[in-house]
UniProtKB/Swiss-Prot annotation:
The gene is atpA. Its main location: membrane. It catalyses: ATP + H2O + 4 H(+)(in) = ADP + phosphate + 5 H(+)(out). This is ATP synthase subunit alpha. Its EC number is 7.1.2.2. F-type ATPases have 2 components, CF(1) - the catalytic core - and CF(0) - the membrane proton channel. CF(1) has five subunits: alpha(3), beta(3), gamma(1), delta(1), epsilon(1). CF(0) has three main subunits: a(1), b(2) and c(9-12). The alpha and beta chains form an alternating ring which encloses part of the gamma chain. CF(1) is attached to CF(0) by a central stalk formed by the gamma and epsilon chains, while a peripheral stalk is formed by the delta and b chains. ATP binds at G169, D170, R171, Q172, T173, G174, K175, T176. Transmembrane segments: none annotated. Produces ATP from ADP in the presence of a proton gradient across the membrane. The alpha chain is a regulatory subunit. GO terms for molecular function: ADP binding; ATP binding; proton-transporting ATP synthase activity, rotational mechanism. Keywords: ATP synthesis, ATP-binding, Cell membrane, CF(1), Hydrogen ion transport, Ion transport, Membrane, Nucleotide-binding, Translocase, Transport. It comes from Buchnera aphidicola subsp. Schizaphis graminum (strain Sg).
Length: 510
């Protein structure tokens, strides 16, 4: 078959018409230095602060310093294979992490990837790790409690849903134990929890996960891990990732709880990154924006209005308010709460629970210092029975500590003073509680009623704990309906008062 010149030219024209040119442009730059996980990039333009930068092998860095000619970025993960001269690209995206119900019961890293060996997580929703806190109009007042299960805290330092309550104290004073017990106590009401481990040993994190699993609380918890062996960039990122995961529940009309363990190590990781980025150091070598580091994180914990939930879900969920309650943990050195990071976080949060080494070592656990522990908004959220019956506990303890200090110098004490000292000792003993043994509202209510109405007068200090154990067993065996009724609505009235008196008298006569 022979083709003439006309047919050949026609074929060429058709091919030219069908030819498509793919014109794809990239915002590309070159790495000019690599230093302890910090890369300097030359040649990138129009970079956003916090933008993801694509590195070889599908790894990412985040732009934190934007200078005239160069970009300072922190690598999210290992950086040994990254060399000078490597080409990198802008993505035009701010870092996002996967969120949703599918993450409950899983252990993930700061980027949201599973690290528990249970396979991949099916999710289709991503949220940015950095988000604006809800405005004043979008918020609701706090009027519902988060029960920690600890008598000392639910009575004296109550926590409301949407509150930020700091747990502060020296190492080995029970800070993590308190937070873990609070998570365990939420399993009864299926309240989603997020536990963020920052800069901790892997052995410690494994123990925490094991305890959550043993008490059936892991299925309701997302564990976000940035251990001490991981890059400072991932330790810096972890709390923001965990917060985004918690906000998913808040913005869908649910209540959620998040624990940051701990923000002292978070501040140290940020200090390391800032110094490597050549930012000017300030007090204790922390950068000038270390307050903003924690304020923008903790302000995202809030109780949001029905309108906010409706707007975020585009009308799919209506008539529901949501909340995210934050329990940040700060470790102090020798009880110094006036250090830079502790004072910052105290001023940001809505109160603090101060755990003291001396109390812990003397066997008072939880080692709550009632004098400087405070909840600024939680009292409005207390259940009626706890609010009514625990009002005199803090006063009694304050008087006891004052008299105990005075009695060391006085040789003889009058009858009234002796009585107050013994009552204070009994209250101190009553507030002691073992780990992983959170108490329900009805159990706390009954014990506070006994203390408030002088039913402890004929019981010695040594027998308080045994008495508590026996009367609670008796209450569940013979007055189960009463205990369940109180757990359900948290009310206290004359009928319940009469039933409590009857229960106590029957127990003492048995």
């Amino acid at each position: 078959m022979q083709l003439n010149s006309t047919e050949i030219s026609q074929l060429i024209k058709e091919r030219i018409a069908q030819f498509e040119v793919f014109n794809q442009s990239y915002n590309e730059g070159t790495i000019i230095s690599v230093n302890d996980g910090i890369i300097k990039i030359y040649g990138l333009s129009d970079v956003m602060l916090g933008e993801m930068i694509l590195l070889p092998d599908n790894e990412y860095a985040i732009a934190l310093n934007i200078e005239r000619d160069t970009i300072g970025a922190v690598v999210m993960g290992p950086y040994i294979h990254i060399t000078e001269g490597t080409k990198v690209r802008c993505t035009g995206k701010i870092l996002e992490v996967p969120v949703g119900v599918a993450l409950l019961g899983r252990i993930v890293n700061a980027l949201g990837f599973p690290i528990d060996g249970k396979g991949s997580i099916e999710h289709d929703i991503y949220l940015p790790v950095e988000a604006d806190a809800p405005g004043v109009i979008e918020r609701e007042s706090i009027n519902e409690p988060i029960q920690t299960g600890y008598k000392a805290i639910d009575a004296m330092v109550p926590i409301g849903r949407g509150q930020r309550e700091l747990i502060i104290g020296d190492r080995q004073t029970g800070k993590t134990a308190l937070a873990i017990d609070t998570i365990i106590n939420q399993k009864k009401i299926n309240l989603p929890c997020v536990y963020v481990a920052i800069g901790q040993k892997l052995s410690t994190i494994i123990n925490v996960v094991k305890k959550l699993d043993e008490h059936d609380a892991l299925l309701n918890t997302i564990v976000v891990v940035a251990s001490a062996s991981e890059a400072a960039s991932l330790q810096y990122l972890a709390p923001y990732s965990g917060c985004a995961m918690g906000e998913y529940f808040r913005d869908r009309g649910k209540d959620a709880l998040i624990v940051y363990d701990d923000l002292s190590k978070h501040a140290v990781a940020y200090r390391q990154i800032s110094l490597l980025l050549r930012r000017p150091p300030g007090r204790e070598a922390f950068p000038g924006d270390v307050f903003y580091l924690h304020s923008r994180l903790l302000e995202r914990a809030s109780r949001v209005s029905k309108e906010h939930v409706k707007n975020v879900t585009k009308g799919k969920i209506t008539g529901k308010t949501g909340s995210l309650t934050a329990l940040p943990i700060i470790e102090t050195q020798s009880g110094d709460v006036s250090a830079f990071v502790p004072t910052n976080v105290i001023s940001i949060t809505d109160g603090q629970i101060f755990l003291e080494s001396n109390l812990f070592n003397s066997g008072i656990r939880p080692a709550v210092n009632a004098g400087i522990s405070v909840s600024r908004v939680g009292s409005a959220a207390q259940t009626k029975i706890i609010k009514k019956l625990s009002s005199g506990i803090r006063t009694a303890l304050a008087q006891y500590h004052e008299l105990a200090a005075f009695s060391q110098f006085a040789s003889d004490l009058d009858q009234t003073t002796r009585k107050q000292l013994i009552y204070g000792q009994k209250i101190t003993e009553l507030l002691k509680q073992k780990q992983y043994r959170p108490m329900s509202i009805s159990e706390q209510g009954l014990m506070f009623f006994i203390a408030e109405n002088n039913f402890l007068d004929d019981i010695s200090v040594e027998n308080i704990i045994q008495f508590e154990k026996e009367i609670l067993t008796y209450a569940y065996n013979y007055h189960l309906d009463l205990m369940e009724e109180i757990n359900k609505d948290g009310n206290f009235n004359d009928i319940i008062k009469k039933k409590f008196i009857e229960l106590i008298n029957n127990f003492k006569n048995s």
